[in-house]
């Protein structure tokens, strides 16, 4: 049986965050997932404690750590003014399903995923809460991240810079084109998002073929609105024990990654993922979805099928690739000319 307990803590921080005689309008939950995280965990927890708007609860799901992660959490819970709940999985769930479990245990109106090894800027929760308070239709908001070394030194760039997610693309996300943008490729990082708990109605369970952040971003964009916040509110630590890290920036690194990973199995997974998304969208009967979303997912599935054929039938690779280019699918569902060249040479 899984072990769940509430650590010693003060009252809900919603009473501590009163400003100008008014209480915050929302209850805010932090969903923190851990696994052998003792090295950096305390620094992350202390950055949550320094928030100008404290969370109302911290829900920690530990994936059967073998180090002193639980002890670090217990010591922190004994002194912080926030309710801290710790659940230890009896068997390992993996990153995505551990986060899904943490989300399901949260009681707040807003849920903020949290990694075990980053550092939050003090205004992070206040900025995110204000975004949702200002827009009742907003389902998910995400922000940039400043990349830091294992020792906590700034690397000089941000996650969005590495992803080439500039002002034009941010503008598209913020003006109703989030689904089209996120279907092309993911720019939503779990450590840099917040979402309304109501999104879980559509998002859970999370299919095995998706990482939680990409899945939540797509479901939020399909069923509501999404906001990108051009501000690095997290110091995103890069180290060799990370399960998910920042994108590679150098052109050679990108080529090497594509050469190693864009094999037949890659496109089989892409087909599986588009089918999962298509099935889930068809099962959101009470949500008002734009008809274009269904056709876009169907078209991306067709694009993946064609790219898979290129791996199986090398003799017709060139005409297939040229056909996809004329249909504009490399631009809609990939990296444009770069993806076209990959299909010709990889």
Task: For the regions a language model picked out, list residue spans one by one.
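C-terminal subregions of glycosyltransferases and related glycan-biosynthesis enzymes
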Residues: 182, 208-210, 214-215, 226, ...
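Nucleotide-sugar donor-binding/catalytic module of glycosyltransferases
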Residues: 7, 13-251
């Amino acid at each position: 049986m899984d072990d769940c307990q509430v650590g010693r803590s003060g009252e809900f921080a919603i009473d501590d965050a009163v400003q100008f005689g008014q209480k915050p309008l929302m209850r805010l939950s932090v969903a923190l997932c851990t696994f052998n995280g003792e090295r950096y965990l305390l620094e992350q927890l202390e950055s949550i404690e320094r928030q100008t708007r404290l969370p109302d609860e911290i829900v920690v799901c530990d994936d059967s750590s073998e180090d002193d992660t639980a002890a670090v959490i217990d010591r922190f819970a004994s002194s912080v003014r926030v309710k801290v709940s710790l659940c230890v999985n009896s068997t390992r769930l993996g990153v995505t399903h551990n986060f899904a479990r943490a989300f399901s245990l949260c009681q707040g109106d807003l849920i903020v995923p949290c990694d075990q090894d980053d550092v939050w800027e003090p205004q992070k929760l206040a900025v995110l809460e204000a975004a949702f308070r200002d827009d009742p239709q907003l389902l998910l908001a995400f922000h940039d991240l400043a990349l830091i070394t294992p020792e906590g030194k700034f690397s000089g760039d941000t996650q969005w810079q590495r992803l080439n997610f500039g002002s034009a693309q941010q503008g598209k996300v913020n003006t109703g084109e989030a689904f089209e943008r996120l279907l092309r490729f993911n720019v939503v990082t779990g450590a840099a998002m917040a979402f309304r708990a109501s999104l879980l109605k559509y998002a859970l369970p999370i299919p095995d073929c998706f990482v939680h952040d990409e899945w939540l971003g797509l479901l939020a964009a399909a069923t509501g609105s999404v906001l990108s916040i051009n501000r690095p509110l997290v110091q995103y630590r890069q180290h060799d024990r990370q399960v998910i890290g920042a994108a590679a920036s150098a052109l050679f690194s990108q080529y090497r990654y594509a050469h190693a990973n864009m094999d037949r199995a890659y496109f089989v997974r892409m087909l599986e993922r588009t089918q999962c998304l298509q099935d889930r969208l068809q099962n959101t009967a009470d949500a008002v979805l734009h008809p274009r979303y269904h056709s876009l997912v169907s078209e991306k599935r067709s694009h993946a099928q064609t790219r898979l054929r290129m791996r199986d039938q090398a003799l017709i690779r060139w005409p297939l690739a040229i056909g996809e280019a004329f249909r504009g699918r490399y631009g809609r569902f990939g990296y444009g000319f770069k993806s076209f060249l990959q299909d010709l040479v990889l």
